[in-house]
Every structure is written in C-alpha cells, then in structure tokens.
Swiss-Prot record:
Its cofactor is Mg(2+). This is Deoxyuridine 5'-triphosphate nucleotidohydrolase. Coiled coil: none annotated. The gene is dut. Pfam families: dUTPase. Its EC number is 3.6.1.23. The keyword DNA-binding does not apply. GO terms for molecular function: dUTP diphosphatase activity; magnesium ion binding. One of its GO terms (biological process) is dUTP catabolic process. Keywords: Hydrolase, Magnesium, Metal-binding, Nucleotide metabolism.
Amino acid sequence: MKLKVTKLEKAAILPKYVHSDDSGLDLSAIEDLEIPPGESQLVPTGIAIELPPNTEAQIRPRSGLALKHQITVLNTPGTVDEGYRGEIGVILINHGKNSFKVTRGMKIAQMVIAPVIRVEVEEVDHLSDTTRGSGGFGSTGLTSD
C-alpha cells in the first residue's frame, strides 16, 4: 500500500517509520516557533498527502514530548480525510509551565494510516438491550474488584 507525499517546501521531511514494526510515521516541523504555556499553535509540516482508498490518517502525540515537555496534539487524534490535499498541520498545545520551542526538523507527532468503515445510518425507535445499558462516565468503577 502506498502513501503519496508531496513536499510543499523543499526542506520538508518526508514522514517515515523509525522501526520496521512502528505503527506511526514521524511528522516533522518545517519551521521554528514557540508555544507559550497554556497556548496552542498550528505547526506546519510542509507536506501534503494522498491517502490510499478507504483510509484516513490519524495525527497522534509523541509520548516523549508529552512526558518530558507536556506537549501534545490538541485534537487527538486529528483526522485527515482521504480527500484532503492541503498541507498537513499539527495543532500542538503546551500543558507545561515553560515555553516550548519547536525547531525546524523536530519530530512533532506521529501519523497512523487506518482503515475507514463507512456505515449506512438507520433511524430506529428503540435500541437493543445490553447489560450495560446507558451506564457511562465511570459506571464500571475505578478498580478491578
């Protein structure tokens, strides 16, 4: 399966897997910028993609940035639809107490290509019963007991 990528900027870095068994391709920043504490920024990558049929790209945080700097993807996972052909941008948010500098070439997020299942929506008067029912938001408890 092929992911077609166009560099919109000569210095853009193509997405790549670091290890052969990685699920996410690393995405890199194309410019330097700063994200103050509590704020978010759209970080450009300088690339556009053409996804394989019936797939989406999910933009996800990098665990190292989250753990060490409290930087994460704001709308995680960000969804890139199959038909989108514009620049891939990553919305990063700084949950930390210090300003964070994004530098050109820095790995800022990972992109996972996933299958998409399209459904036909059917309106019904009643849904089938389950043991869980409408219980949500903590209804299963906090411990495994």
